[in-house]
Amino acid sequence: MMEVDLLYFEKKYHNCIVAGIDEAGRGPLAGPVVASAVIIDNANIITGIKDSKKLSKKTRELLYEQITSNYVWATAIISHTEIDDINILEATKKACSIAVANLSLEPEIVLVDGNMQFKDERFVSIINGDNLSLSIAAASIVAKVTRDRLMLDLSAELPQYLWHKNSGYGTKEHIEAINIHGLSPYHRRSFRCC
């Protein structure tokens, strides 16, 4: 298999300030959606960064600390209630836009994982971007760790839903817990699950 150059898109826009953005939490039945934006420093490449889903929890946590200590980054969180109000796609797009707006450095190009379309012309959608862009991969790590930590806190409040294990996703055990205990205040009412 051919090695992917994770800096291809960053090099393509080498004269620009480039941010990568990714989200965590589009599919779960409970909790917020989180988007993170990261501007990497091409002179200080952190090794091991790749799509958060391909990393162990321990490695994600270590890389999160390195990314947030060395790069410009920002995160936005959209609550489960707002997801229900505006739908998950619009909530995700809103989180992405807020995360970019919260960066301390204004990007000229924003690489976005997936195929979402934005009115802001700086946004460039890249399907499978978390496997093709180092900036997006770094953002995927920050978003996932941030959301997992939020769900861990919620799990301490409502342990019966096992969010410390499932992060709010519709696992068999989570759906069984909903059937036994009903929906919690943190479940998305617009997601029909059981």
Curated annotation (Swiss-Prot):
Source domain of life: Bacteria
Give its localization.
Cytoplasm
Spell out the disulfide connections.
none
Q: How is the cofactor bound?
A: Manganese or magnesium. Binds 1 divalent metal ion per monomer in the absence of substrate. May bind a second metal ion after substrate binding.
Q: What is its main location?
A: cytoplasm
Q: Which PROSITE patterns match?
A: RNASE_H_2
Q: What residues does the RNase H type-2 domain cover?
A: 16-194
Q: Give the molecular function GO annotations.
A: manganese ion binding; RNA binding; RNA-DNA hybrid ribonuclease activity
List the Pfam families: RNase_HII
Which PANTHER family does the annotation name? RIBONUCLEASE H2 SUBUNIT A, RIBONUCLEASE HII
**Family, per entry:** Belongs to the RNase HII family.
Entry function: Endonuclease that specifically degrades the RNA of RNA-DNA hybrids.
**HAMAP family to which the protein is assigned, alphabetical:** RNase_HII_B
Name listed for the protein in its UniProt record: Ribonuclease HII
Q: Tell me what organism the protein belongs to.
A: Rickettsia massiliae (strain Mtu5)
